[in-house]
Swiss-Prot record:
Primary localization class, coarse: nucleus
Keyword Secreted: no
Domain of life: Eukaryota
Signal sequence, renumbered to the chain: none
Family per similarity comment: Belongs to the DDB1 family.
Annotated function: Component of the Clr4 methyltransferase complex (ClrC) which contributes to the establishment of heterochromatin by specifically methylating histone H3 to form H3K9me. ClrC preferentially ubiquitylates H3K14 and ClrC-mediated H3 ubiquitination promotes clr4 methyltransferase activity for the methylation of H3K9. H3K9me represents a specific tag for epigenetic transcriptional repression by recruiting swi6/HP1 to methylated histones which leads to transcriptional silencing within centromeric heterochromatin, telomeric regions and at the silent mating-type loci.
Subcellular location, record wording: Nucleus; Cytoplasm, Cytoskeleton, Microtubule organizing center, Spindle pole body; Chromosome
Molecular functions per Gene Ontology: nucleic acid binding
A GO cellular component annotation in the UniProt record: nucleus
Known partners and oligomeric status: Component of the Clr4 methyltransferase complex (ClrC) composed of at least clr4, rik1, pcu4, rbx1, raf1 and raf2. The cullin pcu4, rik1, raf1, raf2 and the ring-box protein rbx1 are components of an E3 ubiquitin ligase, whose activity is essential for heterochromatin assembly.
The keyword Transcription is annotated on this UniProt entry: yes
Protein name: Chromatin modification-related protein rik1
Length: 1040
């Protein structure tokens, strides 16, 4: 079975560095997933993406260095597959060039794979130091200009050396020392010491070492000034500088990263494990006298900071794996730019009974918790934009005699002609010092209602004015105008002649004039009406109903003979729809989209009329002749929208926002689009209960920046609302580990109990809960204490199955009491249960995958497979095929053959895919369109916020495999053929996983990327190389 994997890579920043990778430009180099992304950085423009460098493995280190005699920096890249290489940017060919080819610097595994690795660059650009194992490093010398010309490389092959100390906790290089001096924080098992070692590059020998600090317990060391050193302890900060030692008090915390402020001497920024930032400053007071100050910066804390980088004087980049990464102006402490990030993903939930294929993601950390709804949405592409501030409303008058755009401001209306390429030309003859409320045109004339008059223009722009006092609202349809006077009177005009008038008891809040002789009206008395009239007749009410709150917006649409659709927005994100036949109510429903009031706008195309529901969660309403349908709409945030159609018949939209106007065109193919809802607590699991979401949440209460307490809750939340209410809370020492839905009114909960001052759970509890008072609260029906923490729950036939510690047990409910029927001990911690029919699949902590069943009295093991590493997640893909995610970021396909006679031959590992990320959740996602080979069958999520899909390939496996090989070869064309072939050999699998990312990415390549790719193919632009790439794209289109 061949599978295709397509992942939406996370935006988490693994690490970052600032340099001049491109000469004369401030560059920020970000490591995100399997790419090195280069951004140009400035205070005015923020982060501007420049180029991306694909990688064949995740990055362990990336360090800039500048070879002598050059004005730009090279990048030294160390990968997690124990390979390093160096690259630089070629200004002539505008492409990445490999300076030093990939070299595997370690051929044996260290005894401690979790030991911290170090990569240090000497500021005098003499050498790069890279860890080989716990005590050994390799010194790679940076070559001089003469040596670089001879060898064609900027670095040599290096030489190894070892420290005479063990248990190294941190390491740095002193600044401006005549001989490279490495300072090591190490321990003898009882106490910690700080020792400096001088490395002689000519003799390749390491000195004996000079003890700088004894019996300290620091968390970080860093260079300070010229040949100075800072040692950070949990309560004190020690400084060695100019032969003196100074100690100051510091916060009780553990430090992680540091960066010197560029342009500032003796100024540093450090961060701790809680995500807080601190400034460390020093100033010279006199001869051998200086001061040292540390203060906490008033910047909100970050989750899991991965890097601190000073770009240039005043700018600081903070990279994060679990929250937004930000570029901050230190002078104003304001955000200049940011890179959004979901954070770790805890759960995936497919939203069933949904006409669109949509799913829900639970993600985040205590400071970045959110629900993300992924729905197929219609997308509005931005074709152009114009910066104009202060616009209240935009209105388009088509073909008079050319398209006119009227922009309403608080005290004036400015008219423009819409030219080609969406250029605007001012038309002063139609501009006025009055605010325009409504506009309509027909037969070479148009009607304009402002705050003080009704104006009718003919084709020669001659106007007839009717002055009306106290106009509060208005709507126009062709030559008719419905004008609200003094809030309560409604006057109907045909051109400049009044044909009907009626005064109401309540003030009118909104109205819509969409069809001849019919008007939809909303009142402050929380009523809506459909009014009818005819020329020279009175106004009568054809339909009337009450609404729960004040109607803010209304739209009335005729959808056939005697059939109307009435939409009323009456609250924050809530609106009600009414379908009427001969003004009798046929159907009504209430919808809730977003959290801000909905405004309605028509969007008429050749295929029919749609209603745009615009707020912070835009939607499109269609299907007026049958059941109403609602499709999410992906569009720029705006507070007003209008439509216009050009001379060729193409339909466009104009959106109004604080930044000005955007010209949009509807893309008819729906795309998977996220919508984020922020939460106060971290959602760990989601279950649907009666059209509501039941969330298992984690609340972290920060006592101060040093400590916090955690509590687990069960909360209910509406699908389109960020408001939630708590239905059950657990005690402070009890963690809610798993929730299992039994039916629409009850659920089974597994917990772990931690005693005070204990790090691991001492036991667990199984709780049966039941809803009462219409999902208002949960009550405990039954509970039982278990000997270990509950890990997983499932339903097995008419009973429940629970995994706790090393045991798996069958639990039954008898007379509202939970009782263990039978149990089995597996000898290792159980990580996951998968129940399919009578078979139970179990993944445990030592990498075993076991299948067994329960015969009514005992468990019987029928198959077992041992992986060479830990299993993090497993799922039943289809039939008897399981997909396994391992700790090293691999996906493995495991087929179960129950008919095999030999117990050890019942599992066959069919293929392997290098995902380079740890999977946190698998979720089945049924296929609806079998014609598309990339239609997902299973979704997966990862620990750094990536979401992906997997699908079986029923045909074209060999063609697609060959196609991905071609694309991959082009993708890594900056490598030599020999280096690429060694990478390709590692990716070969008997039954292939097809990399869907390659195919999708190439389909989206822009022309600039194609030309850059052509340079990569043949190192110069040529028609021949372009034809190769174009042929590849045509092949993709034919297969996909």
């Amino acid at each position: 079975m061949a599978l295709c994997v397509h992942s939406f890579w996370a935006t988490a920043v693994d690490t970052a560095t600032s340099c001049h990778f491109i000469s004369s430009e401030n560059c920020l180099v970000l490591l995100q997933a399997l790419k090195i992304n280069i951004y140009l950085c400035s205070e005015v423009h923020g982060l501007q993406f420049f180029t991306s460098i694909p990688l064949f493995s995740t990055v362990k280190h990336i360090r800039p260095y500048r070879p002598p005699g050059l004005d730009r920096d090279y990048l030294f890249v160390v990968l997690n597959d124990d390979t390093y290489f160096s690259i630089y940017w070629d200004e002539d060919y505008q492409k990445v060039i490999v300076d030093h080819p990939p070299v595997r610097y370690r051929v044996t595994f260290p005894w401690n794979r979790n030991a911290k690795s170090y990569c240090l660059v000497d500021l005098r650009m003499r050498a790069i130091f890279l860890s080989i194992d716990e005590i050994s490093m390799i010194c790679i010398r940076i070559l001089s200009a003469e040596e670089r010309l001879k060898t064609g490389r900027s670095i040599d092959s290096g030489f190894p050396f070892s420290f005479p100390v063990h248990l190294i906790y941190d390491m740095c290089i002193l600044n401006d020392s005549s001989t490279p001096t490495l300072v090591v924080l190490h321990s003898d098992g009882l106490d910690c010491y700080v020792t400096a070692f001088l490395l002689d590059l000519s003799s390749k020998s390491l000195g004996k070492g000079i003890r700088l600090f004894e019996r300290v317990k620091p968390s970080m060391i860093m260079p300070f000034g010229k040949r100075g050193l800072l040692v950070f302890e949990s309560l004190f900060i020690h400084c060695m500088y100019r032969g003196n030692f100074v100690t100051i008090n510091g916060p009780c915390t553990t430090y992680m990263h540091w960066t010197p402020l560029k342009g500032q001497k003796m100024h540093y920024i450090v961060c701790d494990t809680n995500g807080y930032l601190f400034g460390v400053y020093s100033s010279i007071l006199g001869k051998n006298k200086w001061s040292l100050v540390m203060e906490r910066l008033p910047i909100p804390p970050f989750d899991f900071i991965t890097s601190l980088n000073s770009i240039h004087e005043g700018l600081l980049f903070i990279g994060s794996k679990n929250s937004e990464s930000k570029l901050i102006n230190l002078s104003t402490l304001k955000d200049v730019d940011s890179i959004p990030n979901l954070g770790p993903i805890h759960d995936l939930l497919v939203l069933k009974n949904d006409i669109e294929k949509s799913f829900l993601v639970c993600a985040g950390t205590p400071r970045n918790a959110s629900l993300i709804y992924f729905q197929h949405a219609l997308k509005l592409d931005i074709l152009g934009q114009t910066k104009i501030s202060g616009i209240l409303r935009a209105m388009v008058l088509p073909s008079y005699p050319e398209h006119k755009l009227f922009l309403g401001f608080p005290s004036e209306t400015v008219a423009f002609n819409i030219k080609e390429d969406f250029q605007l030309e001012l038309d002063p003859s139609l501009s006025t010092k009055e605010r325009t409320i409504a506009l309509s045109g027909t037969n070479g004339e148009f009607v304009q209602v402002t705050s003080t008059f009704l104006c009718i223009y003919d084709s020669a722009k001659r106007s007839r004015l009717v002055y009306i006092e106290k106009i509060t609202n208005a709507a126009c349809y062709q030559e008719y105008s419905a004008i609200v006077i003094n809030g309560t009177a409604l006057a109907i005009f045909k051109k400049d002649t009044e044909v009907a008038r009626k005064v109401f008891e309540s003030e009118i809040s909104c109205l819509d004039f969409s069809a001849q002789f019919q008007i939809g009206v909303g009142f402050w008395s929380k009523q809506v009406m459909i009014l009818t009239f005819s020329d020279n007749s009175s106004i009568s009410c054809a339909f009337q109903t009450n609404v729960p709150s004040l109607p803010r917006n209304i739209i009335l649409e005729g959808v056939g003979v005697d059939r109307n659709l009435l939409l009323v927005s009456s609250g924050s994100g809530e609106f009600k729809s009414y379908v009427l036949f001969k003004n009798n109510l046929v159907f009504s429903e209430t919808k809730h989209f977003g959290t801000t009031p909905v405004s309605f706008r028509r969007f008429t195309m050749n295929i029919g009329t749609y209603i745009i529901c615009n707020n912070d969660c835009p939607h499109m309403v269609y299907g007026f002749n049958g059941a109403l349908c609602y499709m999410p709409l992906s569009m720029p945030q705006s507070y007003d929208v209008c439509q216009f159609r050009d001379n060729s018949g193409k339909d466009f939209l104009i959106s109004v926002s604080l930044g000005g106007l955007k010209f949009l065109q509807l893309n008819p193919l729906p795309e998977l689009t996220p919508r984020k809802v922020l939460l106060e607590h971290v959602p760990l699991q989601a279950i649907i209960f009666q059209n509501k979401l039941l969330l298992r949440t984690l609340e972290n209460r920060y006592e101060d920046y040093e400590s916090y307490k955690e509590n687990y809750h069960l909360e209910l939340v509406d699908s389109y609302d960020d408001n939630s209410f708590r239905v059950f809370s657990f005690t402070e020492n009890e963690r809610c580990e798993k929730v299992l839905k039994i039916n629409e009114s009850s659920l089974l909960v597994g917990t772990s109990i931690i005693e005070q001052d204990k790090l691991v759970p001492v036991n667990g509890r199984l709780i049966l809960l039941e809803f009462e008072k219409e999902l208002q609260s949960l009550k405990v029906v039954s509970s039982m204490v278990l000997s270990a923490a509950v890990i997983d729950l499932g339903v097995y036939n008419d009973r429940y199955i629970v995994a706790f510690g090393q045991q798996v047990a069958i639990v039954k409910l008898t007379e509202e009491r939970l009782m263990i029927d039978s149990r089995i001990s597996l000898g290792s911690i159980v990580l996951q249960l998968i129940v399919e029919g009578n078979e139970i699949a179990i993944a445990d902590s030592i990498g075993r995958f076991t299948i067994m069943y329960f015969d009514g009295q005992k468990f019987i093991v029928v198959a077992r497979y041992l992986f060479g590493e830990n299993i993090v997640k497993a799922a039943l893909y289809e039939g008897t095929v399981y997909i396994i995610a391992t700790n090293s970021g691999l996906l493995k396909l495991l087929r179960y053959n129950k008919d095999a006679k030999n117990f050890n031959d019942r599992f066959i590992c069919e293929s392997v895919y290098h995902l380079h990320d740890k999977v946190s959740k698998f979720q089945n996602f049924p296929i609806t369109n079998t014609n598309s080979f990339l239609e997902p069958k299973m979704l997966f999520a990862t620990e750094i916020g990536a979401i992906g899909s997997i699908v079986s390939l029923k045909d074209k496996e060999l063609e697609l495999e060959e196609l991905t090989r071609k694309i991959r070869k082009l993708k890594f064309s900056y490598l030599s053929s020999m280096d690429y072939e060694s990478i390709e050999a590692d990716l070969i699998s008997p039954v292939p996983f097809i990399d869907g990312d390659l195919v999708i990415d190439v389909k989206r390549w822009a022309s600039s990327e194609l030309f850059r790719l052509c340079r990569s193919v043949e190192h110069r632009e040529s028609l021949n190389s372009y034809q190769k790439v174009q042929a590849l794209l045509e092949e993709i289109q034919s297969l996909c």
